């Protein structure tokens, strides 16, 4: 159960960030500015970092779902949750960034909602890591490399396609084809 909860969360999070790499770039810039670190990194870093982080999240999610690369996937999930949980507590208390951006514009959570979500996911990551050898594989060990390679190819291709064109799924409130006047009325 913990494995599938983690997998769904990481797949969804990685996918929505990969679909809108520019949106995630802006969120990373918000974080760097809020923590006074914007000048520490070159201008391309938020975009490149966003694409890599979305790919890592998507890879972790697919790996957890199929139980491939079990040690790597559970270790990365646990490390991410150990880092993100205290960070979201800080965000919830001091509110330097309005929302976490963990699910892009697809599902906007408050900082306190994000902290609660991360507590649950941290527990799930601990359980998945502790029982990683007991995770039942959905594919053979010989096919692990193919699933891993395809996963990374898919998510990077998706990110660069959406960067070059428009997002294939647009979660923004003022997406193309939407009546802006009606959107403003419902706010």
Predicted regions, residues:
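Conserved small/polar residues in nucleotide/adenosyl-binding loops
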Residues: 185-187
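Alpha-helical transmembrane signal-anchor/signal-peptide segments
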Residues: 164-183
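Membrane-interface helix-boundary motifs at transmembrane edges
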Residues: 66-73, 133-143
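Membrane-embedded alpha-helical segments of integral membrane proteins
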Residues: 82-135
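Functionalized membrane-embedded alpha-helices
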Residues: 1-18, 46-87, 122
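Solvent-exposed, well-ordered loop and adjacent helix/strand elements within mature globular domains
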Residues: 13-53
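Membrane-interfacial loop-to-transmembrane-helix junctions in polytopic alpha-helical membrane proteins
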Residues: 38-45, 49, 69-72, 106-113
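Internal/C-terminal transmembrane anchor helices
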Residues: 139-167
């Amino acid at each position: 159960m913990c494995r599938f909860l983690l997998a769904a969360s990481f797949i969804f999070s990685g996918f929505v960030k990969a679909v809108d790499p520019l949106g995630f770039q802006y969120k990373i810039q918000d974080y760097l500015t809020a923590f006074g670190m914007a000048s520490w990194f070159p201008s391309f870093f938020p975009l490149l970092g966003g694409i890599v982080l979305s790919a890592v999240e998507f890879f972790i999610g697919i790996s957890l779902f199929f139980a491939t690369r079990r040690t790597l996937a559970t270790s990365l999930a646990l490390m991410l949750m150990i880092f993100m949980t205290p960070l979201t507590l800080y965000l919830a208390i001091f509110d330097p960034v309005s929302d976490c951006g963990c699910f892009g514009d697809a599902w906007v959570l408050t900082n306190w909602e994000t902290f609660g979500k991360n507590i649950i996911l941290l527990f799930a990551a601990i359980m998945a890591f502790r029982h990683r050898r007991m995770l039942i594989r959905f594919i053979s060990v010989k096919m692990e490399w193919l699933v891993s390679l395809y996963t990374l190819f898919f998510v990077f291709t998706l990110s660069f396609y959406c960067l070059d064109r428009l997002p294939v799924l647009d979660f923004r409130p003022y997406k193309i084809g939407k009546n802006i006047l009606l959107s403003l009325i419902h706010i």
